[in-house]
A protein has these predicted regions:
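Nucleotide-sugar donor phosphate/pyrophosphate-binding loop at the beta->alpha transition
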Residues: 17-24, 74, 117, 127-147, ...
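A conserved mid-protein helix/loop that constitutes part of the nucleotide-sugar donor-binding site
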Residues: 20-27, 201, 205-224, 241-244
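Membrane-proximal helix-turn-helix segments that form the acceptor-binding/catalytic region
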Residues: 25-34, 81-84, 103, 111, ...
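Carbohydrate-associated surface elements
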Residues: 161, 183
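Nucleotide-activated donor-binding/catalytic signature segment of Leloir-type glycosyltransferases, i.e.
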Residues: 247-265
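Short alpha-helical donor nucleotide-sugar binding micro-motif in glycosyltransferases
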Residues: 264-265, 272-277
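Aromatic "clamp/platform" in nucleotide-sugar-dependent glycosyltransferases that forms part
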Residues: 285
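Short hydrophobic beta-strand element within catalytic cores of glycosyltransferases
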Residues: 302-305
């Protein structure tokens, strides 16, 4: 029996770049898809600087077509030729952004020569007015997204505030947008009971080290805290374009014996760091969901966040004392007082249980959204 494909297009190679964790997440999607409909198979057309192979399995095929590219015309042509060679019949195209990935899907539909629905996945809060003000590239991308979002069959968002921004600022209909957060790897997290006495006096920044992720806000924060007390450690996990300059400036503030710089980590390695983390800070001016914030809360680590869609959704949905907004304009003493208060706050097990329960259904929700588009 011929199986049709749910096709994921990844011209910039984000799936390959994400490594084993991201690939395994897509494999979970594929297994869930097979359990619901053995007539469909997940196929990923991706790129990579390192891999040049094709990966086949019972549940998912992954084709590495080239090095990462920003050219949707070239990548759509390569994808089309490969799909014809593999005799793949595409029933749905899933794109990962409103730009290169969407236009790859748009041109691929033209090459296929028949109507194929396109689901656009938007993880960032691109419709937040603050996002387009970060730099001139974002302003251009905002207006490009306004057009491409109107052309997509369906849009998968990751949070309620993000959806509200898409509706309000991109003039999209409610019915076009489905909220399905990115699943967490709960198996890797420590779900044992946590005592406050075990929480270390440390502050952590986790994620991409890019200009738009609030890294200079973090530097200002640890500067202020350091002016009041030297009795805390700093943990930095992640990598990115601004890594060299940022870390050099952090080292001028925090001595080596109080500083852990751990680079990019796998989900399993990151999970082991939560028991060494006192408070997680999230200082990106625009945050749509905050998967790391949720992983921290499940692990019993309180979150100190700048006001964003992701933080506001957490606060409004769960009303927990373990999630607080940070006032970066506050005095050094006021910030230290808030930091020490968070170190002592009790873990919120009710919140943890809700997040774990919510996470269980996310893979199935995403796959169902694909099958519904195929049926329609």
């Amino acid at each position: 029996m011929k199986r049709s494909a749910i096709l994921i297009l990844d011209p910039r190679g984000n799936i390959s770049l994400g490594g084993k964790d991201v690939i395994n997440r897509h494999l979970e999607y594929a297994k869930n898809l097979y359990s619901k409909s053995d007539r469909h198979k997940l196929v990923v057309c991706s790129t990579s600087y390192q891999e040049k192979r094709t990966f086949y399995s019972k549940f998912m095929d992954r084709y590495i077509l080239s090095k990462p590219t920003f050219n949707p015309l070239i990548f759509s042509w390569r994808a089309y030729r490969r799909l014809r060679k593999e005799k793949v019949e595409v029933s749905l195209i899933v794109v990962s952004d409103p730009w290169e990935s969407f236009w790859t899907g748009f041109f691929l539909v033209k090459l296929i020569g028949r109507k194929v629905p396109i689901q656009m996945q938007i993880h960032g809060d691109i419709a937040d007015p603050l996002w387009r003000k970060i730099n001139w590239k974002n302003r251009i991308r905002f207006y490009l997204a306004k057009y491409s979002c109107s052309k997509a069959t369906s849009i998968r968002a990751v949070g309620q505030s993000q959806k509200n921004n898409l509706i309000k600022n991109l003039s999209l209909s409610k019915s076009k947008i489905t909220i399905i957060p990115v699943p967490m790897n709960i198996k890797a997290l420590n779900l044992k009971n946590l005592r406050i006495a075990q929480r270390p006096k440390s502050i952590a920044l986790i994620g991409r080290i890019h200009q738009d992720r609030g890294i200079w806000n973090f530097l200002d924060l640890i500067n202020k805290l350091n002016d009041v007390s030297r009795d805390f450690d700093v943990i930095i996990i992640g990598s990115g374009k601004a890594e060299s300059e940022f870390l050099s400036r952090v080292k001028l503030v925090i001595p080596r014996q109080r500083l852990q710089i751990l680079g990019q980590m796998s989900e399993e390695s990151l999970a082991k760091m939560w028991n060494k983390t006192g408070v997680l800070v999230s200082l990106a001016p625009v945050e749509s969901y905050g998967r790391v914030m949720r992983e921290a809360l499940i692990s019993g680590v309180p979150v100190w966040a700048l006001k964003s869609s992701g933080a506001l959704d957490l606060i409004s949905e769960f009303n927990s004392k373990t999630v607080r907004l940070i006032d970066l304009n506050g005095s050094a003493k006021a910030l230290m007082k808030e930091f020490e208060s968070l170190i002592r706050v009790k873990p919120d097990y009710k919140l943890r249980n809700k997040l774990v329960a919510e996470n269980k259904s996310l893979v199935s929700m995403l796959v169902n959204s694909w099958l519904n588009l195929v049926k329609n």
